A protein has these predicted regions:
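Short terminal hydrophobic/aromatic SLiMs and anchors at protein ends
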Residues: 2, 8-23
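Canonical Radical SAM [4Fe-4S] cluster-binding loop centered on the CxxxCxxC motif
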Residues: 3, 61-98
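Cationic, low-complexity basic patches in intrinsically disordered or flexible, solvent-exposed regions
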Residues: 4, 17, 31, 35
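Short, Lys/Arg-enriched N-terminal segments with co-localized hydrophobic residues
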Residues: 22-26, 32-47
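Auxiliary Fe-S-binding modules of radical SAM enzymes
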Residues: 45-63, 216-297
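Glycine-rich, highly charged phosphate/nucleotide-binding loops
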Residues: 96-106
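Conserved AdoMet/S-adenosylmethionine-binding subsite of the radical SAM
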Residues: 104-116, 126-254, 269, 274
Length: 297
């Protein structure tokens, strides 16, 4: 009797702990998203700031020698994100930021050496008016070209950035429509907004590229048919090889890890072989003949 009672009590406690853990995980996910994915409207009145700056890059702006600045916060939770510390930057960076005006002063000192600045994240368009104002000041006060990285979830901000004078946009295409939520790590992908941003870029108002980081097991060959249909006729499209930076989101964020496990199981993230990437590329070329691989050894 006592053995059965002990088993029942242990089982009950374990069940309650499991429920409590899942509840706290869900609450934590909601708190993280609320804190680090403020909308452009919610950021109104917050001064533009960056959470890091690379003073020289030969990779971030195609064909240009540039500086790269990193914005904080993101409305996606891609489990393979290589800048996971920026997703929760406002919590993890402890207030250590770089003021936008300081960045502009740096650029003015580097005129004649640097050719441009790449703005990445995180998701830069979450900064809305602050981002647009910063871009406008860079164009007015320096001779630098400006490149913007984005996931395309805020086409209204993208339009304003184009009007402010950006020179190049690199937009991530996470996956096919059916599996976008899996790769984005979030049920609310704002896919209608993503499609709107795709249309803006295809319209030719600014130079651009689309890109997809192929990650095993998140992507399949069929996904590249879907991606091709989304951006058919694009000027440039790159399939990028996944590389573990040591700062990927799934290893630092319980909510992202839980979402990835529920979506694709427990398989570890990894890179596809060159042959596998070539097969994806062949599919993409049916829709974008100029498609290329990037970052393949």
């Amino acid at each position: 009797f006592y053995q059965s009672l002990s088993y029942f009590i242990s089982y009950h406690i374990l069940s309650q702990l499991t429920i409590s853990y899942r509840t706290s995980l869900k609450m934590r996910e909601e708190q993280i998203l609320k804190r680090s994915a403020l909308s452009p409207r919610e950021r109104k009145g917050i001064h533009m700031k960056f959470y890091g700056m690379q003073k020289l890059s030969l990779l971030d702006f195609p064909g240009k020698m540039c500086a790269t600045v990193f914005t904080g916060g993101c409305n996606y939770r891609c489990p393979f994100c290589h800048n996971s510390s920026l997703v929760e930057a406002e919590r993890l960076c402890g207030g250590q930021t770089i003021d936008g005006e300081e960045v502009i002063r740096f650029l003015r000192r580097r005129e004649g050496i640097l050719e441009g600045i790449a703005i990445t994240g995180g998701e830069p368009t979450l900064w809305g008016e602050q981002l647009v104002s910063f871009i406008r000041k860079v164009k007015e006060q320096t001779d630098m070209l400006v490149k913007l990285d984005t996931n395309g979830t805020h086409p209204d901000v993208l339009r304003e950035c184009i009007a402010a004078g950006i020179d190049y946009v690199a937009m991530d295409i996470k996956s096919s429509e059916e599996r976008y939520h899996i790769v984005a790590g979030h049920a609310d992908t704002r896919l209608d907004k993503v499609k709107e941003s795709i249309s803006i870029l295809l319209g030719g108002e600014v130079d651009y590229e689309f890109r997809t980081t192929a990650v095993k097991p998140l992507h399949t060959a069929e996904d590249f048919n879907g991606i091709g249909q989304l951006i058919s006729g694009a000027k440039r499209y790159f399939i990028q090889c996944y590389k573990d930076s040591g700062d990927i989101l799934i290893e630092s964020d319980e909510a992202a890890a839980e979402y990835e496990r529920s979506a694709v199981g427990t398989a570890e993230l990894g890179a596809y072989s060159k042959d596998e990437l070539e097969s994806f590329l062949a599919i993409a070329k049916k829709y974008i003949p100029t498609a290329e691989l990037r970052g393949v050894d």
